[in-house]
Amino acid sequence: MIKEYKTITLQEIDSIAILKLNRPEKLNAFNMQMLEDIMDAFDEVDRNDNLKAIILSGAGRAFCAGADLSAGDKTFDKNFDTRGEFEEDFRRDAGGILVLRIYNSLKPVIAACNGDAVGVGATMQLPADIRIAKKSARYGFVFARRGIVPDGCASWFLPKLVGISKSLELCYSGDLISAEEGSKIGLINYLIDDEENIIDVAIELAKKMTENSSQVSVAMTRHMLWSYSSEIDPEEAHIMESKLIDSRGVSDDAKEGVMSFLEKRKPKFSNKVSEDLPNFFPWRKSKFKDN
């Protein structure tokens, strides 16, 4: 184990971090302790230069059944969402706090959906770079059925993946959809047979994406594509790409990347995410006082 937590596990396999929601007796229902644990785990992975990517999955037969409803009709009042109190003039939703932390990860994120993902269990997967799922898994954006609205910045992420009309259909109805349907509409990137070990599949995918690439370049690429794919025109993307190419072009990693190609060998990159990010990153300041 990389570190011990109350509601999750965090371990390393082949330089890949495996984060599992670990309340299987509650179908990994989400609570404030889980929020704190996941946030800390992502901080831990970002700090550790030996870890190249993070996989998010669940223990047991479910990925996450959504918010822990054990408080009954008090579940969604302000006493439940204590993490959201902070210093804003409004109470931030816990799912959004979680999703924004995943979104800001410096390492690639793969969601490996081992079973049903409902409510925040579905929305926390949206900021993952890749989403894979077992064929038996189901997804449900059930918020309207609980008398609330989608959380976790879903109104920003979900339409980017499946389009506005399909997003509205999923959120209006709250219907559970199969992973196969999720794959057809763009929610899921890869379907995995139930007999396969989804963690093994996710690890191989993570290694494929990272083992021959500069970690700093991967971190910057992740933030570039997530940040600038939503710009009104491409000029802002061009400005940032130009700055980053200038910055990375004189780095030791750039020299190694060129020479390893010319010498027909695997690269040995030395730059570290913890030390070698450009001095103008992050290029966008958070709107929230607690960040």
Q: Model-flagged regions — what are they?
A:
Residues G58-R101, A117, G147, I232:
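Glycine- (often His-adjacent) and acidic-residue-rich active-site loop
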